[in-house]
Regions:
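Structural signal for hydrophobic packing residues in well-ordered secondary-structure cores
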Residues: 53, 57, 72-79, 83, ...
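A structural signal for short, well-ordered beta-strand elements
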Residues: 21, 35, 57-58, 258, ...
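Conserved C-terminal structural/oligomerization subdomain of aldehyde/semialdehyde dehydrogenase
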Residues: 27-33, 218, 255, 309, ...
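ALDH superfamily catalytic-core signature
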Residues: 220, 228-373, 436, 483-487
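Glycine-rich loop-to-alpha-helix module at the N-terminal edge of alpha/beta enzyme cores
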Residues: 31-119
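Rossmann-like NAD(P) dinucleotide-binding subdomain of oxidoreductase/dehydrogenase enzymes
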Residues: 120-264, 393
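Hydrophobic face of amphipathic alpha-helices that form TPR/SEL1-like repeat modules
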Residues: 1-27
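Residue-level signal for inorganic ion chemistry
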Residues: 28, 64, 86, 109, ...
Length: 488
């Protein structure tokens, strides 16, 4: 298990020898101590990435792609180790780490490995006698900050397109869940990535993250996390006007119309909010039900939520694990009182499970709360836990108004058999993504991101590759003659 910083091709201690405790969310015990990057360590990492950039960006794109493909193979060859590490560190149920986190990580690196030599420029029709073509050039050194909820997948989402496009990387994983990212970079060294191309600096946001965001040698910063921290990233980045990409909070509306397939909608709504204990920016945390089917839906949905097996994430039978930290657990549980104070009804959950084997961990039961109003805090603020807020509507217009009533605009979903209603509603929801008769589907080829206070820029797909490049316009005087403008 690697615990040091990775700078310029080597695992090293922090300059000031600082460390951070990494805790097991199942019982609060110490897993290990990791090196804590300071501003000085970030400076060293940026210097290494700067030195590596000329050769890496000049490497044939097919060679960069080949290394990413080899990394994808290495991830699959070490799949069980990575799954165990991810579940131990984050609390993801091991069945999800095995079936989702690790395969999706490998798939993302493989996708961008194949994409590396397919990033094309263009030729612009201009006046006779001139040729104008546009190249896509890498930004340079990019800083990336990965959150604690899906460290393995988000590492691939960020590094894949950046490296394929020819950039070098300084990435800060969360100090809470850094272990799988450190293992990934170890595999990168093993498959032949050159020194300095990727540098990993786990550390606190107010030190390592702050320095990475403000560093004058970083050409772009890509951040996934809370909206409040995103604002600080933007402020810190202004010194050198670096490009900023933000994937921030969400309060996803999951609308169930009265003609929906209820069996599918109930299963989909449970997946939308309870997968990974609701710790997902795209979680369907607002369940918006047509009043004609609401009672039947809730009876069945609450029954399903109450039956979800909460347990040790390393237990193959566990369907939901702990929240990732004690601090986050305390924050999530405060929303139960907030909801009750505003007239909300707790239909199930709202407390820790009554299981002595889980008493030391950061566990909370799947929770369903019916809000009194769409303006209630529980319906407006991101809880980031297994808490779903139920709201009722009577017309399509009312459903749309509820969906668009928050400051967020990341994920959304709707369930209906009416094709016209589905497409019309999807086009009017103020969100970067909408799922119809499904929820939380992702693919490396499909752009992922939000609008409004959910951020800007996109992960994955061609959009991500473009976000890690600059358009370079080249003009050619075909015949070489230049008529005199200043005649003598």
């Amino acid at each position: 298990m690697q615990t040091q910083l990775f700078i310029d091709g080597r695992f090293v201690d922090a300059v000031d020898r600082g460390t951070i405790d990494v805790l097991n969310p199942h019982d609060g015990s110490l897993i290990t101590k990791i090196a804590a990057a300071s501003a000085a360590d970030v400076d060293l990492a940026v210097e290494a990435a700067t030195r590596a950039f000329p050769k890496w960006s000049a490497l044939p794109a097919s060679e960069r792609g080949r290394l990413l493909l080899r990394l994808a193979d290495a991830i699959e060859a070490n799949a069980e180790e990575l799954a165990q590490l991810e579940s131990l560190d984050t609390g993801h149920p091991i069945r999800d780490s095995r079936s989702l986190d690790v395969p999706r990580t490998a798939a993302c690196f493989r996708y961008f490995g194949g994409m590396a030599d397919k990033l094309q420029g263009s030729v612009i029709p201009v006046e006779t006698g001139f040729l104008n073509y546009v190249q896509r050039a890498p930004v340079g050194v990019v800083g990336q900050i990965v959150p604690w909820n899906f460290p393995l997948m988000f590492t691939s989402w960020k590094m894949g397109p950046a490296l394929a496009a020819g950039n070098t990387v300084v990435l800060k994983p969360s100090e809470i869940t850094p272990l799988s990212t450190l293992r990934i970079v170890e595999l990168m060294a093993e498959v032949g990535f050159p020194e300095g191309v990727v540098n990993i600096v786990p550390g606190y946001g107010h030190t390592a993250g702050q320095r990475l965001a403000e560093h004058p040698g970083v050409g772009k910063i890509a951040f996934t996390g809370s909206t409040a921290t995103g604002r600080r990233i933007v402020e810190a980045s202004q010194g050198n006007l670096k490009r900023v990409q933000l994937e921030l909070g969400g309060k996803g509306a999951n609308i169930v119309f009265d003609d929906a397939n209820l069996d599918a909608a109930i299963n989909g709504a449970a997946w939308a909010i309870f997968h990974n204990q609701g710790q997902a920016c795209i979680a369907g945390s607002r369940l918006v039900l047509h009043e004609r089917i609401a009672d039947e839906f809730l009876e069945r949905f609450v029954s399903l939520a109450s039956s979800i097996r909460v347990g040790n994430p390393l237990d193959p039978d566990a369907e939901m694990g702990p929240l990732t930290s004690k601090q986050h657990l305390d924050r999530v549980l405060t929303f139960v009182n907030v909801a009750r104070e505003q007239g909300g009804r707790v239909l199930t959950g709202g407390s820790a499970p009554q299981d002595s084997a889980l008493a030391k961990g950061y566990y909370v039961r799947p929770t369903v709360i019916e809000a009194k109003s769409a303006s209630d805090r529980i319906a407006q603020e991101e809880v980031f836990g297994p808490f779903v807020t139920v709201l009722r509507f009577g017309s399509d217009e009312e459903a749309l108004a509820i969906a668009n009533s928050t400051e967020y605009g990341l994920g959304s979903g709707l369930w209906t058999r009416d094709l016209s209603r589905a497409h019309k509603t999807a086009s009017q929801i103020n969100a970067g993504m909408c799922w119809i008769n499904c929820y939380k589907r992702v693919n490396p080829g499909s752009p992922f991101g939000g609008v409004g206070k959910s951020g800007y820029g996109r992960e994955m797909g061609f959009e991500a590759m473009h976000d890690y490049t600059e358009a370079r316009s080249v003009w050619v005087n075909v015949d070489g003659n230049v008529p005199p403008h200043f005649k003598r």
